[in-house]
Amino acid sequence: YMFGLYYSDNKKPNFTEDYVLYVRPETTVAQVIDSLQTGAGVLRPRSIERCFEKMEVSAKMKPGRYVIEPSFPSIYVARMLVFGWQTPQNLVLSGTMRNKGRIAKKISTQMMVDSASVAQALDSADFLKGYGFTPENVFALILPDTYQMYWTASVEDIFDRLKKEYDAFWTPERDA
């Protein structure tokens, strides 16, 4: 009996669907289990519950964007949540980038950050000075592209990445 449970929890695939699970800081384990059952098609709910208890998911769960595949056993999903094994998100910045409200909305609909904090950063001379920009010329920092980053990235992480790509693009040869 014990080996059967071990096998069921640790080796046997427990999902029927590919599913992207979003965990916010305020998300509860009950919400995660409910979300997995609805979206990922859990085959053995008790297996998920046992693994979540064993790994203390309720106390240790990390926010993030987790891609669940049908081949995953319950224990792997529990470990993903406890250790924060996120799958990167594609942040797509394209189209018209000349309106701060639109930029803030575009970022916040794809990432965990809210549009108010992005808008605040776009208008903060002190914050932007660290990147060599001002609220007036910040549009130049944002190159239309697809940026792979973690869904939980902070506003600072996002701007660090935008600046890194900006610096990589604007080489002295291109700048001339």
Would you name each region that the model predicts?
Residues Y1-A176:
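Conserved catalytic or metal-liganding residues and their short signature motifs at active sites
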